[in-house]
Protein backbone atom coordinates (compact mmCIF):
# COMPACT_ATOMS: atom_id res chain seq x y z
CA UNK A 1 0.00 0.00 0.00
CA UNK A 2 1.32 3.46 -0.89
CA UNK A 3 2.54 5.31 2.18
CA UNK A 4 0.40 8.37 1.56
CA UNK A 5 -2.69 6.20 1.14
CA UNK A 6 -1.85 4.48 4.41
CA UNK A 7 -1.43 7.86 6.08
CA UNK A 8 -4.86 8.92 4.83
CA UNK A 9 -6.47 5.77 6.23
CA UNK A 10 -4.84 6.49 9.58
CA UNK A 11 -6.29 10.00 9.48
CA UNK A 12 -9.75 8.56 8.82
CA UNK A 13 -9.34 6.37 11.90
CA UNK A 14 -8.33 9.35 13.99
CA UNK A 15 -11.33 11.30 12.69
CA UNK A 16 -13.77 8.49 13.52
CA UNK A 17 -12.53 8.20 17.10
CA UNK A 18 -11.45 11.79 17.50
CA UNK A 19 -12.50 14.74 19.56
CA UNK A 20 -13.68 18.13 18.39
CA UNK A 21 -11.38 20.99 19.37
CA UNK A 22 -12.80 22.64 22.49
CA UNK A 23 -15.32 19.88 23.27
CA UNK A 24 -14.75 17.61 26.26
CA UNK A 25 -15.56 13.91 26.41
CA UNK A 26 -18.13 12.62 28.90
CA UNK A 27 -16.92 12.65 32.50
CA UNK A 28 -19.08 10.09 34.29
CA UNK A 29 -20.65 6.69 33.64
CA UNK A 30 -23.81 6.84 31.56
CA UNK A 31 -24.10 10.64 31.75
CA UNK A 32 -23.30 11.03 28.06
CA UNK A 33 -24.42 14.67 27.90
CA UNK A 34 -22.51 15.74 31.04
CA UNK A 35 -25.76 16.89 32.66
CA UNK A 36 -25.34 18.98 35.82
CA UNK A 37 -27.12 18.29 39.08
CA UNK A 38 -30.43 20.02 39.78
CA UNK A 39 -30.65 23.79 40.09
CA UNK A 40 -32.01 24.41 42.62
CA UNK A 41 -31.30 21.15 44.40
CA UNK A 42 -33.17 19.93 47.49
CA UNK A 43 -31.20 22.26 49.77
CA UNK A 44 -31.47 25.27 47.44
CA UNK A 45 -27.91 24.92 46.18
CA UNK A 46 -26.98 24.74 42.50
CA UNK A 47 -24.45 22.87 40.37
CA UNK A 48 -24.06 25.48 37.63
CA UNK A 49 -21.01 27.68 37.09
CA UNK A 50 -20.52 30.54 39.57
CA UNK A 51 -23.46 29.58 41.76
CA UNK A 52 -23.91 28.87 45.47
CA UNK A 53 -23.11 25.40 46.79
CA UNK A 54 -24.37 23.63 49.90
CA UNK A 55 -21.62 25.25 51.97
CA UNK A 56 -22.80 28.73 50.93
CA UNK A 57 -19.66 29.25 48.86
CA UNK A 58 -19.84 30.57 45.29
CA UNK A 59 -17.93 28.11 43.11
CA UNK A 60 -16.41 28.82 39.71
CA UNK A 61 -16.93 25.25 38.62
CA UNK A 62 -19.77 22.88 37.69
CA UNK A 63 -21.23 19.76 39.31
CA UNK A 64 -21.67 16.92 36.81
CA UNK A 65 -24.27 14.38 37.92
CA UNK A 66 -22.53 11.15 38.91
CA UNK A 67 -23.49 8.34 41.29
CA UNK A 68 -21.16 6.74 43.81
CA UNK A 69 -18.93 4.13 42.19
CA UNK A 70 -19.60 5.14 38.58
CA UNK A 71 -16.56 5.21 36.29
CA UNK A 72 -14.83 8.54 35.73
CA UNK A 73 -13.26 9.38 32.37
CA UNK A 74 -10.63 11.92 31.37
CA UNK A 75 -12.51 14.74 29.59
CA UNK A 76 -9.32 15.95 27.86
CA UNK A 77 -5.93 14.55 26.93
CA UNK A 78 -3.00 15.43 29.14
CA UNK A 79 -0.74 14.53 32.02
CA UNK A 80 -2.61 13.24 35.07
CA UNK A 81 -1.74 13.97 38.71
CA UNK A 82 -3.29 13.01 42.05
CA UNK A 83 -4.84 16.03 43.77
CA UNK A 84 -6.38 16.68 47.20
CA UNK A 85 -9.41 18.98 46.78
CA UNK A 86 -9.71 19.55 50.55
CA UNK A 87 -6.02 20.15 51.10
CA UNK A 88 -5.42 17.18 53.39
CA UNK A 89 -8.01 18.09 56.05
CA UNK A 90 -8.38 15.06 58.28
CA UNK A 91 -12.11 15.51 58.88
CA UNK A 92 -12.75 15.40 55.12
CA UNK A 93 -10.30 12.63 54.26
CA UNK A 94 -12.99 10.29 52.90
CA UNK A 95 -13.65 12.72 50.04
CA UNK A 96 -10.20 14.29 49.78
CA UNK A 97 -9.21 12.60 46.53
CA UNK A 98 -9.26 14.01 43.04
CA UNK A 99 -7.40 14.39 39.80
CA UNK A 100 -5.67 17.23 37.99
CA UNK A 101 -5.10 16.85 34.24
CA UNK A 102 -2.68 19.28 32.63
CA UNK A 103 -3.74 19.49 29.00
CA UNK A 104 -1.55 18.54 26.06
CA UNK A 105 -2.08 18.65 22.29
CA UNK A 106 -5.29 20.51 21.52
CA UNK A 107 -5.69 21.22 25.23
CA UNK A 108 -2.24 22.74 25.79
CA UNK A 109 -2.58 25.58 28.31
CA UNK A 110 -5.71 24.12 29.96
CA UNK A 111 -6.07 22.17 33.19
CA UNK A 112 -9.05 20.24 34.57
CA UNK A 113 -9.65 19.45 38.26
CA UNK A 114 -12.18 16.71 39.11
CA UNK A 115 -13.32 15.78 42.63
CA UNK A 116 -14.05 13.56 44.41
CA UNK A 117 -12.54 10.60 42.55
CA UNK A 118 -10.88 7.37 43.63
CA UNK A 119 -8.17 6.97 40.99
CA UNK A 120 -7.23 3.67 39.35
CA UNK A 121 -3.68 4.97 38.84
CA UNK A 122 -1.90 8.09 40.02
CA UNK A 123 -0.07 9.63 37.10
CA UNK A 124 0.99 9.49 33.48
CA UNK A 125 -0.44 10.50 30.13
CA UNK A 126 -4.15 10.01 29.47
CA UNK A 127 -6.19 10.38 26.31
CA UNK A 128 -9.62 11.99 26.30
CA UNK A 129 -12.14 9.28 27.14
CA UNK A 130 -9.74 7.06 29.12
CA UNK A 131 -11.25 5.57 32.29
CA UNK A 132 -9.25 6.89 35.25
CA UNK A 133 -11.19 5.96 38.39
CA UNK A 134 -14.58 5.96 40.10
CA UNK A 135 -16.77 8.56 41.78
CA UNK A 136 -16.67 9.03 45.55
CA UNK A 137 -19.33 10.50 47.84
CA UNK A 138 -18.45 14.19 48.14
CA UNK A 139 -20.53 14.47 51.33
CA UNK A 140 -19.28 11.38 53.15
CA UNK A 141 -17.92 13.61 55.96
CA UNK A 142 -21.21 15.43 56.56
CA UNK A 143 -24.42 13.90 57.92
CA UNK A 144 -26.57 17.07 57.96
CA UNK A 145 -28.87 16.29 55.06
CA UNK A 146 -26.61 16.71 52.07
CA UNK A 147 -27.24 13.11 51.09
CA UNK A 148 -30.46 14.37 49.45
CA UNK A 149 -28.41 16.46 47.03
CA UNK A 150 -27.95 14.79 43.65
CA UNK A 151 -24.65 12.88 43.68
CA UNK A 152 -22.02 14.48 41.49
CA UNK A 153 -18.39 15.25 40.79
CA UNK A 154 -17.13 18.81 40.63
CA UNK A 155 -15.30 20.05 37.52
CA UNK A 156 -13.11 23.14 37.41
CA UNK A 157 -11.47 24.28 34.18
CA UNK A 158 -8.42 26.53 34.01
CA UNK A 159 -7.00 28.29 30.98
CA UNK A 160 -3.50 29.72 31.35
CA UNK A 161 -3.95 29.41 35.12
CA UNK A 162 -7.28 31.27 35.26
CA UNK A 163 -10.64 29.66 36.08
CA UNK A 164 -13.07 29.75 33.16
CA UNK A 165 -16.62 28.53 32.59
CA UNK A 166 -16.52 24.91 31.32
CA UNK A 167 -20.27 24.72 30.61
CA UNK A 168 -20.20 24.86 26.81
CA UNK A 169 -17.05 22.77 26.62
CA UNK A 170 -19.03 20.02 28.39
CA UNK A 171 -22.59 20.48 27.08
CA UNK A 172 -24.06 21.39 23.68
CA UNK A 173 -20.53 22.03 22.47
CA UNK A 174 -20.52 23.71 19.06
CA UNK A 175 -16.95 24.53 18.11
CA UNK A 176 -15.74 23.91 14.58
CA UNK A 177 -12.95 21.55 15.54
CA UNK A 178 -9.49 21.35 14.01
CA UNK A 179 -9.50 22.58 10.41
CA UNK A 180 -5.95 21.90 9.16
CA UNK A 181 -4.01 18.71 9.88
CA UNK A 182 -0.81 20.59 10.74
CA UNK A 183 -2.54 23.06 13.10
CA UNK A 184 -4.16 21.27 16.04
CA UNK A 185 -5.41 24.46 17.74
CA UNK A 186 -6.61 26.56 14.79
CA UNK A 187 -3.87 29.15 15.28
CA UNK A 188 -4.73 32.23 13.21
CA UNK A 189 -2.43 34.39 11.10
CA UNK A 190 -3.03 38.08 11.74
CA UNK A 191 -6.26 39.50 13.10
CA UNK A 192 -9.32 37.27 13.49
CA UNK A 193 -12.32 37.88 11.23
CA UNK A 194 -10.47 40.02 8.73
CA UNK A 195 -10.93 40.96 5.08
CA UNK A 196 -8.57 39.28 2.62
CA UNK A 197 -7.99 40.70 -0.87
CA UNK A 198 -6.51 37.40 -2.07
CA UNK A 199 -10.00 35.92 -2.03
CA UNK A 200 -12.00 38.82 -3.50
CA UNK A 201 -12.20 40.64 -0.17
CA UNK A 202 -14.14 37.97 1.73
CA UNK A 203 -14.13 38.22 5.52
CA UNK A 204 -13.12 35.39 7.79
CA UNK A 205 -10.15 33.64 9.38
CA UNK A 206 -6.69 32.94 7.99
CA UNK A 207 -5.92 29.57 9.60
CA UNK A 208 -2.25 28.58 9.61
CA UNK A 209 -1.68 25.42 7.54
CA UNK A 210 1.96 24.45 7.00
CA UNK A 211 3.10 21.68 4.67
CA UNK A 212 3.96 18.43 6.48
CA UNK A 213 7.36 16.71 6.43
CA UNK A 214 6.84 12.97 6.89
CA UNK A 215 9.89 10.88 7.76
CA UNK A 216 8.96 8.31 5.11
CA UNK A 217 8.50 10.82 2.26
CA UNK A 218 11.08 12.58 0.10
CA UNK A 219 9.14 15.84 -0.14
CA UNK A 220 6.64 17.73 2.03
CA UNK A 221 3.00 16.84 1.50
CA UNK A 222 -0.10 18.99 1.59
CA UNK A 223 -2.01 18.67 4.89
CA UNK A 224 -5.54 17.31 5.06
CA UNK A 225 -8.39 19.76 5.64
CA UNK A 226 -11.25 18.76 7.96
CA UNK A 227 -14.83 19.92 7.56
CA UNK A 228 -15.58 22.60 10.19
CA UNK A 229 -19.31 21.81 10.09
CA UNK A 230 -21.70 18.93 9.39
CA UNK A 231 -23.13 19.28 5.90
CA UNK A 232 -25.07 17.70 3.08
CA UNK A 233 -23.88 19.58 -0.01
CA UNK A 234 -20.30 20.12 -1.17
CA UNK A 235 -19.56 22.56 -3.98
CA UNK A 236 -16.55 24.10 -5.67
CA UNK A 237 -15.46 27.74 -5.46
CA UNK A 238 -13.54 29.27 -8.37
CA UNK A 239 -12.64 32.91 -7.80
CA UNK A 240 -11.11 34.05 -11.07
CA UNK A 241 -11.64 33.67 -14.82
CA UNK A 242 -9.26 34.43 -17.68
CA UNK A 243 -10.01 36.67 -20.66
CA UNK A 244 -12.03 33.88 -22.24
CA UNK A 245 -14.16 33.34 -19.15
CA UNK A 246 -12.40 30.09 -18.26
CA UNK A 247 -11.37 29.09 -14.76
CA UNK A 248 -7.62 28.51 -14.80
CA UNK A 249 -4.71 28.49 -12.39
CA UNK A 250 -3.47 26.02 -9.81
CA UNK A 251 -4.40 28.27 -6.90
CA UNK A 252 -7.91 29.10 -8.16
CA UNK A 253 -9.74 26.58 -6.00
CA UNK A 254 -11.87 26.22 -2.90
CA UNK A 255 -14.97 24.46 -1.57
CA UNK A 256 -18.21 25.27 0.22
CA UNK A 257 -20.29 23.09 2.55
CA UNK A 258 -23.99 23.66 3.28
CA UNK A 259 -24.75 22.84 6.92
CA UNK A 260 -27.24 20.43 8.47
CA UNK A 261 -28.23 19.31 11.99
CA UNK A 262 -26.71 21.70 14.56
CA UNK A 263 -25.23 23.63 11.62
CA UNK A 264 -28.51 24.10 9.75
CA UNK A 265 -28.57 27.54 8.14
CA UNK A 266 -24.77 27.79 8.11
CA UNK A 267 -22.44 27.61 5.14
CA UNK A 268 -18.66 27.18 5.38
CA UNK A 269 -16.38 28.34 2.56
CA UNK A 270 -12.75 27.26 2.50
CA UNK A 271 -10.20 28.88 0.18
CA UNK A 272 -6.78 27.57 -0.89
CA UNK A 273 -8.01 23.98 -0.69
CA UNK A 274 -8.82 21.20 -3.18
CA UNK A 275 -11.61 18.71 -2.51
CA UNK A 276 -10.72 15.03 -2.20
CA UNK A 277 -11.21 13.35 -5.58
CA UNK A 278 -13.10 10.43 -4.03
CA UNK A 279 -15.66 12.77 -2.46
CA UNK A 280 -16.46 14.93 -5.48
CA UNK A 281 -19.25 17.49 -5.45
CA UNK A 282 -23.01 17.44 -5.02
CA UNK A 283 -25.37 16.18 -2.33
CA UNK A 284 -23.70 13.91 0.22
CA UNK A 285 -23.45 13.48 3.96
CA UNK A 286 -20.44 15.24 5.49
CA UNK A 287 -19.63 14.65 9.16
CA UNK A 288 -18.01 17.47 11.11
CA UNK A 289 -14.29 16.76 11.32
CA UNK A 290 -14.25 14.52 8.24
CA UNK A 291 -11.18 14.89 6.00
CA UNK A 292 -12.69 16.51 2.90
CA UNK A 293 -9.82 18.28 1.13
CA UNK A 294 -6.12 19.02 1.01
CA UNK A 295 -4.42 22.37 1.14
CA UNK A 296 -3.26 23.60 -2.26
CA UNK A 297 0.45 23.12 -2.96
CA UNK A 298 0.88 25.52 -5.86
CA UNK A 299 4.03 27.59 -6.39
CA UNK A 300 2.53 30.65 -4.70
CA UNK A 301 0.18 28.94 -2.25
CA UNK A 302 0.23 30.54 1.21
CA UNK A 303 0.82 28.41 4.32
CA UNK A 304 -2.78 28.88 5.38
CA UNK A 305 -6.38 28.23 4.45
CA UNK A 306 -8.98 30.96 4.59
CA UNK A 307 -12.33 30.18 6.22
CA UNK A 308 -15.53 32.14 5.67
CA UNK A 309 -18.73 31.32 7.60
CA UNK A 310 -22.22 32.46 6.61
CA UNK A 311 -25.55 32.14 8.41
CA UNK A 312 -28.73 32.51 6.38
CA UNK A 313 -26.55 33.88 3.59
CA UNK A 314 -24.79 36.56 5.65
CA UNK A 315 -21.17 36.54 6.77
CA UNK A 316 -21.01 36.11 10.57
CA UNK A 317 -18.29 36.39 13.21
CA UNK A 318 -17.79 33.14 15.13
CA UNK A 319 -14.20 33.71 16.25
CA UNK A 320 -14.75 32.04 19.65
CA UNK A 321 -16.12 28.93 17.93
CA UNK A 322 -13.19 28.77 15.49
CA UNK A 323 -10.58 29.20 18.25
CA UNK A 324 -12.53 27.12 20.84
CA UNK A 325 -12.49 30.01 23.32
CA UNK A 326 -16.22 29.45 23.85
CA UNK A 327 -18.26 26.66 22.28
CA UNK A 328 -21.71 28.10 23.02
CA UNK A 329 -24.21 27.85 20.18
CA UNK A 330 -24.43 31.33 18.61
CA UNK A 331 -27.80 33.05 18.75
CA UNK A 332 -27.95 34.78 15.38
CA UNK A 333 -31.26 36.29 14.25
CA UNK A 334 -32.97 34.49 11.39
CA UNK A 335 -33.06 36.91 8.48
Swiss-Prot record:
One of its GO terms (cellular component) is cell surface. Disulfide bonds join 28-66, 39-46. GO terms for biological process: innervation; regulation of dendrite extension; regulation of dendrite morphogenesis. Residues 1-20 form the signal peptide. Transmembrane segments: none annotated. Glycans are attached at residue 317. It is found in: Secreted; Cell junction; Secreted, Extracellular space, Extracellular matrix, Basement membrane; Cell projection, Dendrite. Zn(2+) binds at residue 63. Belongs to the LECT2/MIM-1 family. This is Leukocyte cell-derived chemotaxin-2 homolog. The gene is lect-2.
Amino acid sequence: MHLRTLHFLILIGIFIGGQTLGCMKKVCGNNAKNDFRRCPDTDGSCGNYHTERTSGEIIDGVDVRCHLGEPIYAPIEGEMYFWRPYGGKREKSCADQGVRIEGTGQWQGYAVHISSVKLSFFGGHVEAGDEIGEALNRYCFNDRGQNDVEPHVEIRLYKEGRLIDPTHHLQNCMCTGQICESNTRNVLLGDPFKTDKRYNGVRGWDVECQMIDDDDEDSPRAPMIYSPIAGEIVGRIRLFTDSNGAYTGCDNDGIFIVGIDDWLGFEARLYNVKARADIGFGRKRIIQGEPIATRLACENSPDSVFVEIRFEGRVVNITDIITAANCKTPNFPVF
